[in-house]
Each structure stands twice: as C-alpha cells, then as structure tokens.
C-alpha cells in the first residue's frame, strides 16, 4: 500500500514537472529562420547562385533574390 502511494505521487510529480517545463519553453527556439531555410532548401529544388529568380517564389538556395538573380 505504501509503495503504491509512493509510485502514484512520483508519477504525479513527474507529470507536473513536464507540464511546467513545456509551458516555459514555448516560443524560445533559437535560429528559427535559419532552420526553416535549411529545411526548405533540402525539401525542394532550388536555384544556385546567379540563376534568375523572383522575389515572391523563394526558389533560391541561398534564400535571397536581388535584382532578379539568386545571391
């Protein structure tokens, strides 16, 4: 009986700790833009440096389109 109570209290304590840390870590991802650009270039075909591009299509591997050329 005592062991059962100890196990129940331990499980409740660990669950509470996980919920508290999950709320605290929301929105704290570092380098979010860098990570999404990396995923984009890995999942889609992208154009190399100097290729023609449009600013609205985001198809350059570098992520930047200046004056119609990937930079």
Curated annotation (Swiss-Prot):
Entries under PROSITE patterns matching the protein: OMEGA_CONOTOXIN (PS60004)
InterPro entries: Conotoxin, Conotoxin_omega-typ_CS
Disulphides: 46-61, 53-65, 60-70
Organism superkingdom: Eukaryota
Signal peptide extent: 1-22
Chain positions found as Cysteine amide: 70
Propeptide: 23-45
A GO molecular function held by the record: ion channel inhibitor activity
Cellular location(s): Secreted
Keyword field: Amidation, Disulfide bond, Knottin, Neurotoxin, Secreted, Signal, Toxin
Free-text tissue specificity from the UniProt record: Expressed by the venom duct.
GO cellular component: a single term: extracellular region
Transmembrane segments: none
Family: Belongs to the conotoxin M superfamily.
Function: Omega-conotoxins act at presynaptic membranes, they bind and block voltage-gated calcium channels (Cav).
Name recorded for this polypeptide: Omega-conotoxin-like CnVIIG
Source species of the chain: Conus consors (Singed cone)
């Amino acid at each position: 009986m005592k062991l059962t109570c100890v196990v129940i209290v331990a499980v409740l304590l660990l669950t509470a700790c996980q919920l508290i840390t999950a709320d605290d870590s929301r929105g704290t991802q570092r380098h979010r833009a860098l990570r999404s650009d990396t995923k984009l270039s890995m999942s889609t075909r992208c154009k190399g440096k100097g290729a023609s591009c449009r600013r609205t299509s985001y198809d350059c591997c570098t992520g930047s389109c200046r004056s119609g050329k990937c930079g």
